[in-house]
Swiss-Prot record:
The active site is at S134 (for autocatalytic cleavage activity), K171 (for autocatalytic cleavage activity). The keyword DNA repair applies. Represses a number of genes involved in the response to DNA damage (SOS response), including recA and lexA. In the presence of single-stranded DNA, RecA interacts with LexA causing an autocatalytic cleavage which disrupts the DNA-binding part of LexA, leading to derepression of the SOS regulon and eventually DNA repair. The gene is lexA. GO terms for biological process: DNA repair; DNA replication; negative regulation of DNA-templated transcription; proteolysis; SOS response. Residues 29-49 bind DNA. One of its GO terms (molecular function) is serine-type endopeptidase activity. It catalyses: Hydrolysis of Ala-|-Gly bond in repressor LexA. The record marks A99, G100 as: Cleavage. NCBIfam families: lexA (TIGR00498). Homodimer. This is LexA repressor. Keywords: Autocatalytic cleavage, DNA damage, DNA repair, DNA replication, DNA-binding, Hydrolase, Repressor, SOS response, Transcription, Transcription regulation. Gene3D superfamilies: Umud Fragment, subunit A, Winged helix-like DNA-binding domain superfamily/Winged helix DNA-binding domain.
Length: 216
């Protein structure tokens, strides 16, 4: 990052890093505004655009959590997967998972990739390549690698990898009044209501995200 940040911009960048470290995902504009005492999310948006111009982050238009911390300027977009100084943890990359309409997941490991363990809130067990845009507003986009920790249980509101029969999907878990729903983060998609008769299981929880392609 070649351009020096203002004190306020550094505060926002630190907040983004802390939120990603704690939750695995960046904060929303409203969360930034609340944490730093801005009057509205628009003030946070102005600072985020300045950070993007200075090369500290990348922004995804239309996504409430569409904030990406950038790798060093001299690194290629995929460097966080292959750079020898960062590749300290080797994870299997499992077949593509639909983050739109659920599709049959590939069970074989496509390859193994080395990643920086500091990218994640917990140590993941594998990476899943996302296809589709149903989790767009959580900042999870087509082609992203979702870091997943195997888990049979999850807290309400966590982003999970869930299996319905032989199909796998990435959604936000919601339990309410004894009912389980898998919620998208895109108004173009409908929630999935899990019936008592469905063959349902949690495959894991999301603990981080890696982008392998630059934002446009």
């Amino acid at each position: 990052m070649a351009t020096k940040l203002t004190e306020r911009q550094q505060e926002i960048l630190d907040l983004i890093r802390q939120t990603v470290a704690r939750t695995g995902f960046p904060p929303t504009r409203a969360e930034i505004a609340q944490a730093l005492g801005f009057r509205s999310p628009n003030a946070a948006e102005d600072h985020l655009k300045a950070l993007a111009r200075k090369g500290a982050i990348e922004l995804t238009a239309g996504a409430s959590r569409g904030i990406r911390l950038k790798v060093p300027d001299n690194a290629a977009p995929s460097a966080q997967l292959t750079h020898p100084l960062l590749a300290q943890l080797v994870l299997p990359l499992v077949g593509r998972v639909a983050a739109g309409s659920p599709i049959l997941a590939s069970e074989h490991v496509e390859r193994e990739v080395g990643v920086d363990p500091g990218l994640f809130t917990q140590t993941p067990d594998y990476l899943l390549k996302v296809r589709g845009m149903s989790m767009r507003d959580a900042g999870i986009l087509e082609g992203d690698l979702l870091a997943v920790k195997r888990a049979a249980e999850a807290r309400n509101g966590q982003i999970v990898v869930a299996r319905l029969g032989d199909e796998v999907t990435v959604k936000r878990l919601q339990r309410q009044n004894g009912r389980i729903e898998l919620l998208p983060e895109n108004p173009d998609f409908s929630p999935i209501v899990v019936a008592n008769t469905d063959d349902f299981a949690l495959e894991g929880i999301a603990v981080g995200l890696i982008r392998t392609q630059p934002l446009h």
